[in-house]
């Protein structure tokens, strides 16, 4: 079977099957973990002007070993059952890797959101939510959607309002969906979460001197060059945070209209501002060389230390894998590297940080938002002022004991209590760092495990298996 004929779901299962022998689990249990438990296909009408349009939509719940299930909703003309099943499976493994207590799920609506005005999109979204309610496929203890490609906080607010309308007695209704606006029980830091998680994951990978030496790089992320393909939410935040907090030099950026390249570095904030002012195009940007749409895929082949594909799946395949010149590939998108390309890149000693770990920042902060909704209180409200007062007292004692005054600037920095955004970022950093260390430990301790992706699957499979074995089989 050629690479082009292998479905996305089959590709995910191929990776699963490659990792399964390293778990020593019985075949029946592995089959249960791998299977999609529930697949819902919906066709519902929406009135648009004087006409009716039938909308094709899906919701897949891959695994019920933990509840609720969790996964985003994407709006795209390319949505199909196989894709949604694959993404739901990846969500199960992703949640297990980062110790988020959800089963995996995913939703999709087969439309191009850019073809509709806001009023029509609201109709489509609210009716989709109603279809989920009718099938008992949404709720804070059942299945919790989130944003994905083509959706955002606006759509999540519509979903929340629709669910709340039909579940008036559910005091935890806000927990039915995450990625909501902050004004509608959202959490600070959710918008940047996936991109920030990508940065934390890549930074942790670069912190191991032995691994960096193997690919001819020095320890640490600072000073490394990066190319980012895709300037959506994930790609833009990854680039901005990597530049601002990691000291990374962005040398190439690609999008649907083409790409820009400057080996001396590109100011990502300046580039994003230019593209916004230039009707969504890089063309004419003075800080780099622009290459048009027909050359856009060449951005993946630019020389760099770190390549971040942050758009769609299968962009790195057997046709271009030999031309990839990066030392590290950070899979910010879902499934950007095909299994055939992975084998080629492995032979070339290129490190691939797998998607099921690297883009888990979104579901991690969604978990924080869900917890906030169930507790009905923002993070930091109870302890912020207490911690500030304790810190001020400690500074006063320090000044008295040393006879030296702390500057007002230092006092403000040291004494400040953690706000919600600080706690969210800290929790995300801890999650990504500890998860990478678990994956690397499995990889390092088992020389027969070929790569980080296989190690990540081993970690995920073992954690899910432990849940199934602890729960038993009913009846």
Segments (PLM) and residue ranges:
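Adenosine-phosphate binding glycine-rich loop
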Residues: 2-7, 205-206, 322-323, 327-475
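Flexible, glycine/charged-enriched surface loops at secondary-structure junctions
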Residues: 26-32, 99, 137-146, 171-173, ...
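Glycine/serine-rich phosphate-binding loop and adjoining beta1-alpha1 elements at the start
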Residues: 76, 96-222
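Glycine-rich phosphate/diphosphate-binding loop of Rossmann-like nucleotide-binding domains
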Residues: 181, 185, 189-301
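Rossmann-like adenosine-cofactor binding region
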Residues: 258-352
